[in-house]
């Protein structure tokens, strides 16, 4: 009922297409004795983080990537965590790996991320790889921004010349997404906004594409959207009843031309491009 008019940007169907391609590429790598391996480092027993990690390894099984898990207690020291990362850096079976965030408060997240071998940075969030993105040099790309761009292209949403309003300034989505969209291969014009931006509805009504990644429940409403615009819902938070919701209000479906559901939109592609980063590195190593 709420989705009258808008075309669904279906992340699950798009992910499945990517997985078919990845499975063929992993089969070829395995035949050459170069099976990719994805490592995960999980600290503590947060149910959400555990579920995310389980999902990533289930994805690995679907395409033939080896799983390497390092599950650590919540009270682990910074030194022991860094030793675990050093071990994965040196492990030839580990093509790439991620540190599941957030870490417990007594641990230094930035120090952990910087300890990852940039070549094994499956999330594309190492400072060196983010710097390469700024310089437009080849490197692993952040998974969620890459997934957003792929999803828009898959449904033929015009990016070149488009005015894109990104709401959210986090390092995992907002900041790197602006860098991706302004490359010559995308050629979008990006306005980066956040929860303290003045006159936000006025800005979003001028957008061809809105990316909502602020983590504020239902902050983007129909009144903020130009008819026919594409709206991508990335934010995840809980409403007053404790239910997981996105940043986009359901009434947006009645106005927009394209909308990504949440869940089922960008999330599946974040995981798909995590595996893609690992497979691409395995192919590069095999080629060298």
From Swiss-Prot:
GO cellular component entries: cytosol
GO terms assigned for molecular function: methenyltetrahydrofolate cyclohydrolase activity; methylenetetrahydrofolate dehydrogenase (NADP+) activity
EC number, as in UniProt: 1.5.1.5, 3.5.4.9
Keywords on record: Amino-acid biosynthesis, Histidine biosynthesis, Hydrolase, Methionine biosynthesis, Multifunctional enzyme, NADP, One-carbon metabolism, Oxidoreductase, Purine biosynthesis
Residues annotated for NADP(+) binding in this entry: 168-170, 195, 236
Gene Ontology biological process terms from the UniProt entry: L-histidine biosynthetic process; methionine biosynthetic process; purine nucleotide biosynthetic process; tetrahydrofolate interconversion
Pfam hit, one: THF_DHG_CYH
Pathway annotation: One-carbon metabolism; tetrahydrofolate interconversion
Catalyzed reactions per annotation: (6R)-5,10-methylene-5,6,7,8-tetrahydrofolate + NADP(+) = (6R)-5,10-methenyltetrahydrofolate + NADPH; (6R)-5,10-methenyltetrahydrofolate + H2O = (6R)-10-formyltetrahydrofolate + H(+)
Complexes and interactors: Homodimer.
Function statement: Catalyzes the oxidation of 5,10-methylenetetrahydrofolate to 5,10-methenyltetrahydrofolate and then the hydrolysis of 5,10-methenyltetrahydrofolate to 10-formyltetrahydrofolate.
Family assignment from sequence similarity: Belongs to the tetrahydrofolate dehydrogenase/cyclohydrolase family.
NCBIfam families: PRK14193.1 (NF010789)
Name recorded for this polypeptide: Bifunctional protein FolD
């Amino acid at each position: 009922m709420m989705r009258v008019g808008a075309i669904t940007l279906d992340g699950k169907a798009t992910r499945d297409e990517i997985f078919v391609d990845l499975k063929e590429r992993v089969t070829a790598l395995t035949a050459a004795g170069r099976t990719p391996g994805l490592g995960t480092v999980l600290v503590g027993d947060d149910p959400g983080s555990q579920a995310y990690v389980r999902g990533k390894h289930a994805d690995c099984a679907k395409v033939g990537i080896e799983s390497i898990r390092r599950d650590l207690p919540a009270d682990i020291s910074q030194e022991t965590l860094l030793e675990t990362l050093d071990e994965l850096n040196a492990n030839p079976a580990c093509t790439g790996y991620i540190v599941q965030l957030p870490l417990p408060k007594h641990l230094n997240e930035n120090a952990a991320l910087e300890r990852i071998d940039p070549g094994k940075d499956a999330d594309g969030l190492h400072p060196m790889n983010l710097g390469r993105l700024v310089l437009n040099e080849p490197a692993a790309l952040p998974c969620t921004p890459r997934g957003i761009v792929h999803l828009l292209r898959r449904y033929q949403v015009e990016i070149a010349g488009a005015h894109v309003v990104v709401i959210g300034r986090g390092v995992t989505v907002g900041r790197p997404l602006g860098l991706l969209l302004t490359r010559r291969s995308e050629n979008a014009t990006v306005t980066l906004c956040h929860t303290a931006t003045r006159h936000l509805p006025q800005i979003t009504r001028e957008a061809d594409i809105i990316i909502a990644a602020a983590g504020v429940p239902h902050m983007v409403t129909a009144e903020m959207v130009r008819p026919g615009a594409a709206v991508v819902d990335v934010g995840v938070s809980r409403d007053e009843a404790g239910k997981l919701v996105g940043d986009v209000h359901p009434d947006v479906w009645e106005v927009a031309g394209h909308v990504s559901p949440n869940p089922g939109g960008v999330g599946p592609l974040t995981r798909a491009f995590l595996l893609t980063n690992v497979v691409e590195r395995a192919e590069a190593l095999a080629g060298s």
